[in-house]
């Protein structure tokens, strides 16, 4: 494919135009009085959202230089979303302000490399002040307040606070569709996975069609159980104890399944067979999680273990197991707390090191099943479009609340950035173009509060001047247009969100300013129209 090349100011201005188109679309959503953006979909109903990264992902510009500029800012939003789960609009607004201020100075003759160093040093100094000003989350009300700000809905804030209070920081809060209007909250006790009994003959409770095993032994195997010999040996060992047996295997079929069912129906031996969840390496990892939780050992050919020769030491235990048609829940596994804690630490390390969103999500689910629990917020609304929009807001608010628990809270509404910058100025001693780069950051941090004020119908400059004269922690509550103590009023932002927004914006701004040439794909010429049919003489 042919390429287009632009240099110097032409390259930067083309990229800047793309940045502005994306940022101007995203920033209308900032603050409690921000507006929504409607996203057209090729199939199905349009999506209505105020989530910066969702809007950014949908923007695809025709001009190749503009497209590159927009893609760089998308990266700001995506990186902030990956790290903190929120703050994508703030990051976009900061990036736009930093790039505009920086390009003015590049055009005036400043050295882009020195500007970039100054921007990075000033951003680091402000982040240091933000972290120092953090207030730990100590109450359920504080979690509710920060989730309410993110979702713009007090009911959502309360539900999220209740969910996180129950499942803990390592727990998972998922958001699902509800077939009735409103919000419902469900909790899962113990480890639950999406596989049910292999045959309905294992059911012990006919009313709700579940198999309930009290104080069972648990056999975990990575292979299939097909022959009678695969189950008879272990069944005879467990039968002597008078306790039931849960079998979790790749599959149970052939002679093995009717052997278990027949003993179950006769009342000779109570058991239940379930397929192992997941596939491939993920299945192996989940079986190992269950082994650690229950104190079992996974029986597999790789370890040289055979079902016809193992003893009771490979079996795990649990207080109770509940198996339905579609899912299995293991309550109070008998594994060692130290082993569970070590496994949790290992999974946390894997989460920190993975670059895949899908892998991260699956690892977090495994972490929750081991260390916390699972809460499900079910969302119902009058229309599909409204339900999707509300669901999206709740997902953002959950991640916002988790970020607050992790690193603490700051005054919201863009105030923390201005007040941290005022303190950081004294620590940043630079000269020349590096000092100019730092000054760019100290001006750019005003952009979020200015945009919040303008979205609320106020003058941004007037609000900034007023906030500068107020004590630390006080600022504009844009929801009420009152100046007050923002932490006391529940107007807060997680430290993780605010610092990630600034760090990612500063990083992309530095790349923008130091760009001297852009190589882009040349647009394909439009296809020629098909030739008209020949005149047949009629």
Curated annotation (Swiss-Prot):
Task: Provide the alphabetized UniProt keywords.
Answer: ATP-binding, Chaperone, Cytoplasm, Isomerase, Nucleotide-binding
The terms describing its cellular component in GO are: cytoplasm
| Top-level EC class as recorded in UniProt | isomerase
Q: What is the annotated localization of this protein?
A: Cytoplasm
Molecular functions per Gene Ontology: ATP binding; ATP-dependent protein folding chaperone; isomerase activity; unfolded protein binding
The biological processes this protein is annotated with in GO are:
protein refolding
> What Enzyme Commission number(s) appear in the record?
5.6.1.7
**Which CDD domains does this UniProt record tie to the protein?**
GroEL
Q: Which reactions does this protein catalyse?
A: ATP + H2O + a folded polypeptide = ADP + phosphate + an unfolded polypeptide
On subunit structure and binding partners, the annotation says: Forms a cylinder of 14 subunits composed of two heptameric rings stacked back-to-back. Interacts with the co-chaperonin GroES.
PANTHER family reported for this sequence: 60 KDA HEAT SHOCK PROTEIN, MITOCHONDRIAL
Q: Which family does it belong to?
A: Belongs to the chaperonin (HSP60) family.
Record HAMAP family: CH60
Protein's recorded name? Chaperonin GroEL
Biological source species: Bifidobacterium adolescentis (strain ATCC 15703 / DSM 20083 / NCTC 11814 / E194a)
